[in-house]
Amino acid sequence: VFYIREVPHRHLPLLILAALLGATPAFAACTAPAAPEVNWRRCLLDGRDLTGVDLTRGHLRDASFQRARLGQAVMIGADATDARFLSADLTGADMTDANLRETDFTRATLREARLIRADLRRARLFRADLTGADLTGADLTGADFNGAILDGVRWTDGERICAAGSVGTCQ
């Protein structure tokens, strides 16, 4: 049982302000430099040049990287569930063992990307360019490859290589 005592009216605005500030999420981590295990959850990183950064085991859930440059980025074991990489350049990025469930890669460039054992369940790869990417052991359950370029992609079994001209499905 909680008892609330009457608060003098002069303290009421201060209490309301304290309650509002306590209820807002902390975004200070969004200014943290790129580093392994960085916490960029829900951060807006649209258009940033993050070429070659190490985001190993990074917390990237719900973050936005629209039109960002992440070529050669190391994102091994990162959690990017529900993140948005629309039109981002991830050429040669290493996302081995990454959690990419429901992540949106619409029109992203993932040429030569390593998505080995990545969890891509229900990911959106609409019109993405995955030329030469490695999907060995990846979970693609419910993933949308509509219009995706899959030339030379190493498929989930680690053996099959998609033929030139593969769009939407591995031929």
Description of each model-found segment:
Residues 3-14:
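Bacterial N-terminal signal peptides that target proteins for export
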Residues 13-23:
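Bacterial N-terminal signal peptides
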Residues 26-171:
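Tandem repeat scaffolds
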Residues 2-3, 22:
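N-terminal targeting/docking segments
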